[in-house]
């Protein structure tokens, strides 16, 4: 799925977070500070859940939470593509990228995590309180949201 669509009830508080980079404990502390309600609220992550920090598997586990959704960032892409391309794997394992943890996983778990991260959408469109909000990890190739969605849906753009 390249584009994911969500409609969020008006009584839900929506929070958005950037690059978590495996800092699960810090994320949970910040959610507590802002009064995040796990039974009612929604947290949207704009990619880069993993790498660089120490709590990678916990951050991947966020994808199983009903209150959490994410799009794919370049670090999720590194995990998946690094399983098949030695050049990407080499780059991903460099200390500044922080991907070593991924290749230390047992093979079956590494494949499962890589596949799960690759399933994340590239674009997220949220309808909330009568408005439409669009999320991507980085930049779009065009400045028109609808055109960008169509390009991704029709596979004119590879991510």
Which residue ranges define each predicted feature?
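Core catalytic region of metal-dependent phosphoesterases/phosphodiesterases
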Residues: 11-13, 17, 22-94
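Active-site neighborhood of divalent metal-dependent phosphoester bond hydrolases
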Residues: 56-126, 130-135, 141-142, 147-159
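Acidic, histidine-bearing metal-coordination/catalytic regions of metal-dependent phosphoesterases
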Residues: 1-14
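Short, flexible hinge/linker loops that cap or flank conserved catalytic cores
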Residues: 7-9, 37, 127
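Short, flexible, glycine/charge-rich loop motifs used to bind or transfer phosphoryl groups or to couple energy/partner
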Residues: 4-6, 33-34, 124
